Amino acid sequence: MDDHNLEEFRRHWQEELAQSQALRRRRRLEAGERRSPRRPEAGARGEPASGYLGLAQGLLEGAGRPPAPRPGRGGDRKDTSSRSRSPPDRDATEPEPLVDQLIRDLNELDDVPFFDVRLPYELAINIFQYLNRRELGLCAQVSKTWKVIAEDEVLWYRLCRQEGHLPHSRFSDYTCWKLILQECLAKEHTLRANWKNRKGAVSELEHVPDAVLCDVRSHDGVVIAGYTSGDVRVWDTRTWDYVAPFLESESEEEDPGMQPYVSFVRINSSLAVAAYEDGILNIWDLRTGRFPIFRFEHDARIQALALSQEKPIVATASAFDVVMLYPNEEGHWHVASEFEVQKLVDYLEIVPNTGRYPVAIATAGDLVYLLKADDSARTLHYVYGQPATCLDVSASQVAFGVKSLGWVYEGNKILVYSLEAERCLSKLGNALGDFTCVNIRDSPPNLMVSGNMDRRVRIHDLRSDKIALSLSAHQLGVSAVQMDDWKVVSGGEEGLVSVWDYRMNQKLWEVHSRHPVRYLSFNSHSLITANVPYEKVLRNSDLDNFACHRRHRGLIHAYEFAVDQLAFQSPLPVCRLPRDIMAGYSYDLALSFPHDSI
């Protein structure tokens, strides 16, 4: 019964479909006759492929446009032309669906011949070595072959060295240089955030109790300081448990308790140099011991001292003489060159990377001298009535500030000279106040920073001879300044140390101490500042106590912003006085500087 009903339903359904198709065909014929009454035979023929679908199928099959119908005389010709315009049999040539055609075209685009070029691996590495890390990442997404080349360890090792990370490492030290570069970039980002947020550790270096601070310098985290007691002390701020030694002098054994003041101190990676008020110069080798390896004596007070940061070369200025000292082939120190100048020297610097013969720059009043070890003193700049107020040198240029005096007042300027051509390249500034400090050695390329007594810090663009940025920094004038690729650190006469983000023209933070900031130096992760008093005389209300009060002796601060390198298990790095030293027995230091671990 069920099978009979199913067959009957199928028969009725097919009849309905046939009737509906016949009805639709009849309606189309009637509509065609009404539209074109002159050609009633066209609808009778019923061309099945006269629409756009037939045209599209013909194009896909490779055929051109169907030919236009030609008028014929008889019914035979009409039947022949109708059969010629009809589409081919579906069983003979099955047309490809549009979706399959699209997929086939996309598959043809996958294999680009440019990516399949077979190059030697070494040649591909030489081509890819000129790309930065962003471009290498884009190349790694092109194909599997390019990904292997873009992730080669040699490329990432070179890229890591080019960006200044791990400069002393070798290729065999690590196995994945791409990961090492990512870690270095993450640390750099953390360091920059710590600088901006003032997040890190601050250390006040141990003082000499019965002396006043005279001069401070540092090199790569190693700090040297000289005091009115004649003591010279060295700290290594890279380690918290380092005990700062005193550098002994030969005069201490001869006349104990009668030490002259320390006028200047300088330090590099291997040497420490100190100049005293009585004209004595001591040179220590930091790798051998605490006693000087060379002693030189001038007839008068030493007015300027310079030490090369790369080589063991020392230059001193006393009275009207400038002396250059460096060791010979056997290691014995001697006077290599001696120059005579017309006026007392105010500033003295040694030019870095000068080759075999050292070169120094000295300013004496309104004279600027170029001193070469194999030549006599030559005048680099001279304008009567315009004395030099500051000096700094780089490998190829020298910058110094001049004070404009006389009948024609042109404003105070900074002059930049080429050491090779010995001529003036730029005249910068034109300020009302005196330029007190300038830094071209540590500045980024084509930039220079200066400080002025008019309370402003200026960033100069050496390419356009214009002031790129001017910051109102310190109320009593700027005394020290340094910049890098994004920040400026300045110190003032009022004892304020300020950190600026000069790209945003914004002050990040500042710290204050009692005495003027005479020295500051920073690198990527640390900052050294020194507040040196004006007065070098001991003052204490208690005559029985010869210890100088803390507010008169000066301060040295060391800031460390790479907190991941700090050992917080050590005692609080605010003060490094051990328990057996009673330097502050006359006043309470226990609350401010605890010794116990926290």
From Swiss-Prot:
Changing S86A: Abolished phosphorylation by mTORC2, leading to increased protein turnover. It holds the Pfam family F-box-like. The keyword Hydrolase does not apply. GO terms for cellular component: 3M complex; Cul7-RING ubiquitin ligase complex; cytosol; Golgi apparatus; perinuclear region of cytoplasm; SCF ubiquitin ligase complex. Residues 29-44, 73-93 have a biased composition (Basic and acidic residues). Residues 113-159 form the F-box domain. Residues 20-97 are annotated as: Disordered. GO terms for molecular function: ubiquitin protein ligase activity; ubiquitin-like ligase-substrate adaptor activity. Substrate-recognition component of the Cul7-RING(FBXW8) ubiquitin ligase complex, which mediates the ubiquitination and subsequent proteasomal degradation of target proteins. The Cul7-RING(FBXW8) complex mediates ubiquitination and consequent degradation of GORASP1, acting as a component of the ubiquitin ligase pathway that regulates Golgi morphogenesis and dendrite patterning in brain. Mediates ubiquitination and degradation of IRS1 in a mTOR-dependent manner: the Cul7-RING(FBXW8) complex recognizes and binds IRS1 previously phosphorylated by S6 kinase (RPS6KB1 or RPS6KB2). This is F-box/WD repeat-containing protein 8.
